[in-house]
């Protein structure tokens, strides 16, 4: 029964994951995954988004201590904002920790000045990721001292759910957002494999606070999903004979080789990519006239590809029976040793 149900190897799998960082910052990235089976773009995109926004570990300020201030419904002499406003601003400070243990940071300032996160004395184990973030405004000849406790955690923890129930008198717990991922959006578009045009392309946009690069955040989220889903596999796979008879195909196994594995010039490779030619089988079914009608594809590119095809005893304008096969991705993986 398992052999009949074992189709996870026949489903089309992404060729690669493409990361594109935005030029103004390394904290934003566009991630493109293709091709995927129909419906898998939405399935994977939604799962990855939920994990990215809820389950990654990061650091945050969890409590503050200001001399002579015992609760958030107070005012600080010489400070324009009341304590609740100061706490709200402190919640916006983004931090990165290099150790797992909590650290206490200190802030000392004399007015008049605008107090920012960059004025906090952090030590070597903590970094402030947004040093220009405003905490409060201090009046002339006034002083402010504050201790800020920083910890590692995950998700969003309310001050009322703080895991330290017995804080010292005068220490005020604050809501803590540990997650290093600030936003995740995704969309699903159609993509083409051979002559099939309705596979999924997953496009994700991920922004972090700088604690992690988007590529690392996506990798960690995928690892978390992998660990959780592993528990659902309730059977054992038997090692199968991987020897494949090449004469079982109605065409040459070289047709299953991807054109991006050929040593083509950049111009030729881009022309094939723009024309959605994925496999050599897609290529040899075209005639020379078809190729010359391709935008930016000239006689020089044609001769270059003809020489490469000749090495495999292939040519343009071939009649290939049963092309493209339905399980082209699986066949390409199975016959890889035959054409490499």
Swiss-Prot record:
Family, per entry: Belongs to the RNA polymerase alpha chain family.
Annotated domain remarks: The N-terminal domain is essential for RNAP assembly and basal transcription, whereas the C-terminal domain is involved in interaction with transcriptional regulators and with upstream promoter elements.
SUPFAM superfamilies: C-terminal domain of RNA polymerase alpha subunit, Insert subdomain of RNA polymerase alpha subunit, RBP11-like subunits of RNA polymerase
NCBIfam families: PRK05182.1-2, PRK05182.2-5, rpoA
Region (Alpha N-terminal domain (alpha-NTD)): 1-236
SMART domains associated with the record: RPOLD
Enzyme Commission designation: 2.7.7.6
Assembly, per entry: Homodimer. The RNAP catalytic core consists of 2 alpha, 1 beta, 1 beta' and 1 omega subunit. When a sigma factor is associated with the core the holoenzyme is formed, which can initiate transcription.
A GO term from the CC aspect: DNA-directed RNA polymerase complex
Purpose: DNA-dependent RNA polymerase catalyzes the transcription of DNA into RNA using the four ribonucleoside triphosphates as substrates.
Name of the protein this chain belongs to: DNA-directed RNA polymerase subunit alpha
Species per Swiss-Prot/TrEMBL record: Rickettsia felis (strain ATCC VR-1525 / URRWXCal2)
One of the protein's GO biological processes: DNA-templated transcription
GO molecular-function term, one example from the UniProt record: protein dimerization activity
Chain spans, region Alpha C-terminal domain (alpha-CTD): 246-340
Protein's UniProt keywords contain Secreted: no
């Amino acid at each position: 029964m398992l052999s009949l149900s074992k189709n996870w190897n026949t489903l089309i799998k992404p060729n690669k994951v493409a990361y594109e960082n935005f030029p103004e910052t390394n904290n934003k990235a566009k991630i493109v995954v293709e091709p995927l089976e129909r419906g898998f773009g939405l399935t994977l995109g939604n799962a990855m988004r939920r994990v990215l926004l809820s389950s990654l570990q990061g650091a945050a300020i969890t409590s503050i201590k200001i001399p002579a201030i015992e609760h958030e419904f107070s005012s600080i002499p010489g400070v324009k904002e009341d304590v609740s406003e100061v706490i709200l601003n402190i919640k916006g400070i983004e931090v990165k920790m290099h150790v797992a243990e909590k650290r206490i940071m200190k802030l000392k300032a004399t007015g008049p000045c605008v107090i920012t996160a960059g004025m906090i004395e952090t030590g070597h184990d903590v970094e402030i990721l947004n040093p220009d973030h405003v905490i409060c405004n201090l009046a002339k000849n006034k002083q402010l001292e504050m201790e800020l406790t920083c910890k590692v955690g995950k998700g969003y923890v309310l001050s009322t759910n703080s895991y330290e129930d017995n804080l010292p008198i005068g220490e005020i717990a604050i809501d803590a957002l540990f997650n290093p991922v600030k936003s995740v959006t995704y969309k699903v578009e159609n993509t083409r494999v051979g002559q099939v045009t309705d596979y999924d392309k997953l496009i994700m946009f991920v922004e972090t606070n700088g604690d992690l690069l988007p590529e690392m955040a996506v990798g960690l989220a995928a690892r978390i999903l992998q660990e959780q889903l592993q528990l659902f596999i309730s059977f054992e796979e038997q090692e199968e004979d991987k020897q494949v008879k090449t004469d079982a195909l109605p065409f040459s196994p070289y047709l299953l080789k991807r054109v991006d594995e050929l040593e083509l010039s950049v111009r030729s490779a881009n022309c094939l990519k723009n024309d959605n030619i994925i496999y050599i089988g897609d290529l040899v079914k075209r005639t020379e006239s078809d190729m010359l009608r391709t935008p930016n594809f000239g006689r020089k590119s044609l001769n270059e590809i003809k020489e490469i095809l000749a090495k495999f005893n292939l040519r343009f304008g071939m009649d290939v029976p049963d092309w493209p096969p339905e399980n082209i991705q699986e066949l390409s993986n199975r016959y890889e040793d035959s054409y490499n």
